[in-house]
Amino acid sequence: MATSMIQRLFKQGTKIVGVGLNYASHAKELGNALPKDPIVFLKPTSSYLENGGTIEIPHPLDSLHHEVELAVVIGQKARDVPERLAMNYIGGYALALDMTARELQVSAMASGLPCTLAKGQDTFTPISSVLPKAMVLDPNNLELWLKVDDETRQKGWTKDMIFKVPYLISYISSVMTLFKGDVILTGTPEGIGPVKIGQKITAGITGLSEVQFDVGRRLKPLLR
């Protein structure tokens, strides 16, 4: 079932909606103030990478930053959804990584430009198989973790999210229509950091899901 759901997600989903700075600890480590409203950005579905794949670092970058996140998979068309009804629009959950080319992000932000190149490249959204909704009793009480090789880098709980899952669905659907197969990346806890070519990322939702990805070089250089 999980395999068919992930394939359906790849084929049906129209967008990936990222949420930035949704953990106070992460905002603090970046030196940012806590957001008053969700910080929303888009990633293309072409950035998906299935479990076991290789995350590609584009030339001439030496590293990418890892950000482990709970992914919410939308189960039906959602527009202007009240927060109290938001959970009815969830089709499932997954573990995802929001891989970020931090050098490109910092440069873009300094120039007032969008961060699409920093977050939207091929393989920049590694994702697990989809967990059916019934398997996740409370999405706001899950432990996320990530290791690089054998070193634990990130460990946090979704209960520490500033904006919880129902509010995110309500807020985002008031701005843009969400379709079946769309994914919301709900933010990352503290501990982000660089991963380099030749390293291996292992990440999971404790008791529910685990993924593993190699890190390699994208052969074709980023055009300048």
Curated annotation (Swiss-Prot):
Keywords: Isomerase, Magnesium, Metal-binding, Mitochondrion, Transit peptide
Cofactor note: Requires a divalent metal cation for activity. Binds copper in vitro.
The UniProt record lists the keyword Hydrolase: no
Catalytic activity from the UniProt record: oxaloacetate = enol-oxaloacetate
Coarse class of the protein's main subcellular location: mitochondrion
Organelle transit peptide residues: 1-30
Places the protein is found: Mitochondrion
Gene3D superfamilies cross-referenced by the UniProt entry: Fumarylacetoacetase-like, C-terminal domain
EC numbers: 5.3.2.2
MF-aspect GO terms: acylpyruvate hydrolase activity; copper ion binding; oxaloacetate tautomerase activity
SUPFAM superfamilies: FAH
Single Gene Ontology BP annotation: oxaloacetate metabolic process
Any Pfam family: FAA_hydrolase
GO cellular component: cytosol; mitochondrion
Reported cofactor(s): Mg(2+); Mn(2+)
Residues annotated as binding Mg(2+): E67, E69, D98
InterPro entries assigned: Fumarylacetoacetase-like_C, Fumarylacetoacetase_C_sf
Function: Tautomerase that converts enol-oxaloacetate, a strong inhibitor of succinate dehydrogenase, to the physiological keto form of oxaloacetate.
Family membership noted in the UniProt record: Belongs to the FAH family.
Name listed for the protein in its UniProt record: Oxaloacetate tautomerase FAHD2, mitochondrial
Gene source species: Arabidopsis thaliana (Mouse-ear cress)
